[in-house]
Structures are given as C-alpha cells and as structure tokens.
C-alpha cells in the first residue's frame, strides 16, 4: 500500500470557483473546482458512508439524505443521488456546500487517508497495449462524464477484459452500452487477440 497524494496547497485557495456538469447517468452530477484535488491518475470512490470515513468532504456529503455515492478525481467531485430529489433542487445545495467546505479550509482527507494499492509493472505486452488504449482513448472520455475506468484483469486464453467503472459510470443506465459499443469495439480494433 502507498500513501495517497492530494494537493493540500491547492485546497487552500482563497477563491473557490465551482461549476457543475451533467453526466450520462441522470442520478450523477460532476462538480468541477478551479484547483487540483488529487494527483493525475488517482481517484477515490466512496460507494457508502462507511467507505468515506477517511474523507471529511465525502462523509459530510453523505449527510444529505439523498446522496448515495461520492467520487473524487483530479479537479472534480461526482455526486450520485437517489430519486427522492431532482437536480434542480440538489445541484445548488451541493455546489454551495462544496464551495463552503473548501472556503472553510477543511481537509479533503483526515489523518487516516485511504490507502491505494501499489501496482507492480510486470504486465504482458497485451496488457500494456490494453492499458495504453484505456489511457489514451477511453479514460479521457469517461472522465469528462464524471467517472473513471480502471483495468482489472485480462484473460488471454478467453480474450476477456474486465474493467472497473467508478463515479458517474457506476450504476449508469448507459454503462453497458458504453462497455459493449464503445470499449469492446475499440479494444477489438486496436488490440489484437
């Protein structure tokens, strides 16, 4: 396990600007801030209140009864809600909350920061190629929608690739279409079995 790296310096900006972007998942909204929260390539998914215990921001966002998931990446926070409230009401409430959280100079993580797995780089050529396609073509599109995609495993015998979808992609009604039509087709074209 390695220590999480997030930008403490940038969190203490005097001018916090935040805007929201909708995502393909109608229950998720991406809240973008004007500073870097987490170093490039890292992300943190909090699917439950219990999983959010190391992050005061995620924990406090779960204080909104309708929040069901919180996700941090680079310069944005994706919040997923239930159907009890519409975004026309929830959006300004959450946006103001996030802005005030950072204006109050609260930390993104407490002293018990979540640990990340150390990834050993002993990948086969096929896996390196797959990860390259994920990084260059797929990850940027998924991040624009407020989500993240991570390589999970590749079975060379079966030709089966498993990925992990996080943030707005988790539970999104169109995620199966994204996987089948987008990712599967691209992998078949760019990575030969």
Q: What are the functions of these language-model segments?
A:
Residues 2-193:
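Domain-level signature for proteins that mediate thiol-based redox and metal-cofactor handling
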């Amino acid at each position: 396990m390695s220590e999480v790296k997030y930008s403490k310096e940038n969190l203490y900006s005097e001018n916090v600007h935040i805007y929201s972007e909708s995502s393909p998942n109608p229950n998720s909204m991406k809240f973008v801030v004007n500073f870097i929260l987490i170093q490039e390539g890292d992300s943190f998914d909090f699917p439950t209140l219990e999983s959010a215990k190391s992050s005061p921001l995620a924990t406090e966002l779960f204080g909104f009864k309708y929040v069901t998931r919180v996700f941090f990446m680079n310069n944005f926070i994706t919040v997923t809600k239930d159907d009890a409230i519409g975004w026309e009401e929830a959006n300004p409430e959450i946006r103001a909350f996030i802005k005030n959280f950072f204006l109050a100079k609260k930390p993104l993580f407490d002293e018990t920061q979540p640990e990340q797995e150390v990834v050993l780089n002993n990948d086969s050529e096929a896996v390196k190629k797959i990860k390259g396609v994920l990084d260059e073509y797929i990850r940027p599109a998924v991040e624009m929608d407020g989500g993240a995609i991570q390589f999970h495993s590749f079975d060379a015998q079966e030709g089966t690739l498993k990925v992990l979808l996080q943030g707005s992609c988790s539970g999104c009604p169109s995620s199966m279409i994204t996987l089948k039509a987008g990712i599967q087709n691209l992998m078949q074209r760019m990575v030969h079995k």
